[in-house]
Amino acid sequence: MINEIKITDLSEAESYAFGTNNKYDIWISATDEEDMHKIKRMKKLLHNKGVTHYYQFFYDWSDEDGIEWDHLETLGPQLKHVENIINFLKPFVDDDKVHNLGVNCFAGVSRSTAIGIIASVMTGKTPYMAFDYIKTVRPMAWPNLRILRFASDILKQDLKTTIENWKRTKIGGIYTGGWS
């Protein structure tokens, strides 16, 4: 079971990998390919601390602005990326042992918070409860709707609408995307 989730940016994740804190026994990194050397170094350091680390490279692009971007289908989050993340998490969610999960992306705002919501929903929380929890651990959360759309399809539960509705209520101009 996943007990606690920590959301960080890449810099804080690197500090954790180099540090002596061993609170988190599983870690997911979702970053751009340009950060590959940092992530591979982190993986080695986390492994030496006994942390199971998984990483996925894709850009933090979403389709929530209502514009069709050709690069989304090659560089943005893909269904296979989200499937891989869910498949990585499943044994830890189903395990009777208590696990603490760390998640990072470059800024700790979009990809990582979406993954945190996915992990929380997999543990039995509703999407609303999951997002509420993630906002307490990462107040600047702005989850990637494309990732949540794919997760909704895989988990057969709507993770996207709660966050999409929340984004609509935020201060004017921050989210100007179209919803279809």
PLM region descriptions:
Residues 1-56:
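Glycine-rich, flexible N-terminal cofactor/catalytic loop recognition
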Residues 32-33, 58-61, 106:
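Histidine- and/or cysteine-centered catalytic micro-motif in compact active-site loops
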Residues 36-37, 64, 110-114:
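Short catalytic/ligand-binding loop motif for oxyanion handling, primarily in non-cytosolic enzymes
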Residues 81-85, 111, 115, 130, ...:
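Amphipathic alpha-helical interface surfaces
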Residues 92-100, 117-180:
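PTP/DSP superfamily signal
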Residues 100-118:
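A phosphate-binding catalytic loop at a beta-strand-loop-alpha-helix junction
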